[in-house]
A protein has these predicted regions:
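Short alpha-helical transmembrane segments in multi-pass integral membrane proteins
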Residues: 1-19, 77-142, 186-241, 297-364, ...
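N-terminal transmembrane alpha-helices
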Residues: 6-43, 60-72, 76, 101-108, ...
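Transmembrane helical elements of multi-pass membrane transporters/channels
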Residues: 17-36, 138, 172, 201-205, ...
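Helix-terminus/linker motif at the lipid-water interface of multi-pass membrane proteins
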Residues: 31-49, 119-126, 182-189, 248-277, ...
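Small-residue hotspots at the loop-to-helix junctions and early N-terminal turns
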Residues: 46-57, 132, 136, 195, ...
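Small-residue-rich hydrophobic transmembrane alpha-helices
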Residues: 49-109, 146-165, 271-329, 333-335, ...
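Hydrophobic transmembrane alpha-helices of multi-pass small-molecule transporters
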Residues: 61-64, 176-180, 206-210, 281-284, ...
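Short runs within selected transmembrane alpha-helices of multi-pass transporters and secretion channels
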Residues: 70, 139-157, 165-173, 194-207, ...
Length: 445
């Protein structure tokens, strides 16, 4: 594996080359979740779209646990790999896979038991509750596939092989959309058809990804290594838990804020659901830069090159600025067309106004989450997790407080006004921590 470009090539080039396959892969992943919503909205009903939307923020939390856990484990793997300790690399990878698979089974069982209760507590409109429960139960049954897929992808990224999960994701995405159309349009399975299509597609990706991972290790000629090492769990958990918090902050905020949106009825929920699907796609470049900066920082600190870490952070901010400008140019003129792709020609006025209003406002503020993600990636890669975690909790608190306190008084618009305020606050706290230079000393310890 000749993947030392993260510690040798120019920072801008290294980050872009590393992040690009992740961006493309995540775009495909978000595209097929968007396709789920669009197919349900067009071929079933607006209420079916609202049901999937009612489940979305909750399912996103589990996705974030999987992604955050994978990122946390990948920092440890990246350090071993950057230091050329390949046996420890292999052991750390398998330990992460075993630990997070066990966690996914436990969470899946809990989800199946409490899915209806959770949706009721989130104030889900009664006319879409049963549909949302059906969708969630199938989702929870497939949770191990979701966790395995995301952790495997993170392991490939840590090894500098970010193109491998991309290939499987492209296949899985195309297969998922085809199954969506077959099960929803032809077999009339409604929201359950969408859930089954996702489960099957992710299962295939997991099997293929694991086979290739084993093959990649054989190419390294590592020899025998332990498949599970308990001593690796604590350092992984120390980084994984704050990473999960960081990844979940947005989704937990979305879930609590959605409970406010739910109170405005299923039509507003349908429009909001369409908008946040698009928002998730817009955030993909920044999440990918976050992952790239994290691995870049970990590998360069492992190679004892602090100067390159700072150079990489500056390069990441330039990438964030470029993507932010691109998003403004794409979203602002076309938000009505984008929302109508989900709602169809017979979408209600309330749904259209809600979706368009959200996107039109948010398009100007994606730079805030981008700059936040860049500095968060550096802090996490260096293992500086304390203030990192505090910043993300502040983000969550502000978003939820502003939405829940002011939306019932001033209207639904307060829901989206709360979002950039939280992002900006998070960035300020994380950036000030970066400027102190504590991350250098923490890594050395």
């Amino acid at each position: 594996m000749n993947n030392d470009y993260l510690v040798k090539k120019k920072p801008m080039y290294a980050l872009f080359v590393f992040a690009l396959p992740i961006i493309i892969g995540n775009i495909f992943q978000q595209t097929y979740t968007m396709a789920d919503s669009a197919i349900v909205g067009r071929f079933v009903s607006e209420k079916a779209l609202a049901a999937v939307g009612a489940s979305y923020s909750l399912t996103n939390i589990f996705i974030c646990v999987a992604i955050g856990g994978g990122i946390g484990a990948s920092v440890i793997v990246s350090r071993y790999f950057g230091a050329k300790e390949y046996k420890k690399t292999k052991t750390a990878v398998y330990t992460a896979l075993i630990a997070f698979t066990a966690l996914s089974v436990l969470l899946g069982i809990i989800g199946l038991v409490f899915s209806r209760l959770i949706l009721i507590l989130l104030n889900t409109p009664s006319d879409v509750l049963d549909l949302a429960v059906d969708y969630l139960n199938i989702y929870f049954a497939g949770l191990p596939f979701l966790f395995m897929y995301n952790v495997l992808s993170a392991m490939f990224n840590a090894l500098g092989k970010s193109k491998i999960p991309l290939y499987f994701l492209i296949f899985s995405s195309v297969f998922n959309v085809a199954l969506d159309l077959l099960l929803v349009k032809n077999f009339r399975m409604g929201v359950t058809g969408v859930a089954w299509a996702t489960l099957i597609a992710q299962g295939i990706s997991v099997v293929l990804s694991f086979i290739v991972l084993v093959w990649e290790f054989k190419k390294l000629n590592i020899g025998r290594a332990k498949f599970f090492e308990k001593s690796e769990l604590l350092p992984m958990a120390k980084i994984a838990f704050p990473s999960i918090i960081q990844q979940s902050t947005v989704s937990i905020g979305m879930m609590l804020v959605q409970s406010v949106v739910n109170g405005f009825g299923s039509e507003a929920l349908a429009g909001y659901s369409a908008a946040i699907r698009v928002e998730s796609l817009c955030i993909v470049p920044f999440n990918s830069i976050n992952n790239a900066v994290s691995s870049y920082t970990a590998q360069n600190l492992g190679a004892k090159n602090e100067k390159r870490v700072v150079e990489g952070y500056h390069a990441a901010n330039i990438l964030v600025a470029a993507f932010s400008i691109l998003l403004i140019l794409l979203i602002e003129p076309f938000n009505g067309l984008i929302v109508s792709m989900f709602l169809g020609d017979d979408g209600t006025i309330t749904a259209m106004n809600t979706g368009c209003g959200y996107l039109s406002f948010m398009g100007w503020f994606f730079c805030f989450i981008g700059f936040k993600m860049a500095v968060d990636g550096l802090l996490r890669g260096a293992g500086d997790m304390k203030m990192f975690t505090v910043a993300n909790f502040v983000n969550l608190f502000i978003r939820v407080f502003v939405a829940m306190a002011f939306a019932p008084i001033f209207g639904l618009q307060m829901v989206w006004i709360a979002v950039p305020i939280g992002w900006f606050s998070n960035w300020v706290i994380s950036f000030l921590e970066y400027r102190t230079g504590k991350w250098k000393r923490i890594y050395k310890r």
